Amino acid sequence: MHAFKAINGKTVPDLYLNISHFLDHFIMLVFAKAAYDAGRYFGLGYEEIMVCGVGGFVLFGGMAPVAAHLADRFSRSALMVIFHFGIGLAAILAAMAQSIWQLSAAIGLIGIFAAIYHPVGIAMLIQSNQRIGFRLGVNGVFGNMGVAAAPLVIGVLLTVGDWRLCFVASGLFCIAYGMVFMLRLVEDSAPAAKKAAKGVTGFAPGWQMALGAMLMSTASGGFIFGAMTFVVPRYFEISLPAISTSVAVTGLLASIVYAAASFTQIGVGWLIDRVPPKWVLFSVGVGQVIFVALAASFTDYALFFAMLVAMCFVFGQIPITDTILSRYVPDSWRARVLSVKFMINLMIGASVLPICGVILQSGYEMAALFSLMSGLAVMIVLAGILLPVQSDAQRLDRQPAE
C-alpha cells in the first residue's frame, strides 16, 4: 500500500508513455502470431484455437471505462504501473496454460490489463498542454510500430522456441519495463488540481458540437481504418500483377504502405498545433474521400501510390480527435471520455470483418469495399464542417497551470 502511495499523482516523460503504447499493441498480438503453434500443441486447427483470443479483445475494449473510473478514483500513475506488471504476469500465465480454457482465461486477463493504456496513458500524455498534437502523433506511431513489430518478433521467437516462449519472453520484458517505468515517475509540476483551482472545472464552450463531431469522425474513421488495414494486403495480391504476384512481395508492399503512412501522424500532429483542428479534420476527410475512391479504380503502380496517399490520410486522422478532446474536455473527465471513444472504436472495428464478408459474399468485388469506405469518409468531412472554431481563450489546453 505504501508503495502505491509513493507513486500516486506522478507523471513520466513522454518517451516512457510511448513505449508503453508500443507494448500495449504488441502484447495484444502475441497470440495472433503464436496461435498456430499453440493450436498444434492442443490438437486444434488455426480457426479453432483463434476462438481463445476473442475474450481478450472483448475485454480490451469493454474494460476501458472501468480502468478510467479506477484511474479517476485512485491514480493514473498507479494504474499505469499496474498495467505493465499486469500484462506481463498475464502473459506468463498464458505460457503456463495446460488447457485451452486456461489459455483463454489468461488471454482474457491480458485484455483486462491492456485496457488500461488508452484511457489512462493517453490522459497522462495530454495532462501537459505543450504541443499536444505533435506528441499525440509521435505516440500514435509507437502504437503502430507495436502492431508491426509483433509478427516479426514473435516469428523470430517461434524459430528458436514455441508459443510458450513467445508469451514468457514478452511477459518478462513487460515486467522489466514496468520497473523502469516506475523508477522514472516524477512529481507532476502542473497537477490537475492546480488547474481546477484556476476555474478549469467545466467543459469548453461548444463542447457538445465538438464531441458530436468527434463521435462522427471516430465511428466512420474507425471503420475505414479497420477495413483498410485488413483488406489492403489481399487487394494488393489481386491488383498488382505488373509488380508481383508473390504473396511475400505484395505483403511487403502492404507493410511499407502501413509503416510509411503511420509517420503522417507526426506531421498532422505538428500541423494541428498551429492550425485549427476544424480545417485539419476537414482536409483529412476530403483526402480520404478522393484517394480511397481512386484506390478502387487503379491497379499496379498507380494503385500502390494511391493507396499510400490514402493510408496517409487514414493514419493522419488518429491524433486529431484526442487533440480536440484536450481542448474541450477538462482533465477530470478526459479518462472517461477517452475510454468511451476507445470502446466505440473497438465495437466499430469488430463490425468490419462481418460487414466486409457479407459484401463480398453478395457477389461484389473487393473494389466495392473501397467505394463504400470513400462514401463513409464523407462523414469525416461533415464532422470537420460541424466542429467549432475556438479562440485561444476558450481552449482548455491553453489554461494556465498555476
Positions of PLM-derived features:
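A late C-terminal transmembrane helix in Major Facilitator Superfamily
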Residues: 328, 332-364
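C-terminal transmembrane helical hairpin of 12-TM major facilitator-type secondary transporters
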Residues: 275-321
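Symmetry-related core transmembrane helices of the 12-TM Major Facilitator Superfamily/SLC fold
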Residues: 165-182, 368-386
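Helix-loop-helix hairpin linking two adjacent transmembrane segments in secondary transporters
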Residues: 139-186
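Residue-level signature of mid-helix packing/kink "hotspots" within the transmembrane helices
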Residues: 29, 57-65, 147-148, 258-266, ...
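Extracytoplasmic gate region of multi-pass secondary transporters
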Residues: 31-32, 210-262
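Conserved MFS/SLC helix-loop-helix module at the cytosolic interface between two early adjacent transmembrane helices
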Residues: 62-98, 272-275
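Cytoplasmic helix-loop-helix junction between adjacent transmembrane helices
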Residues: 106-143
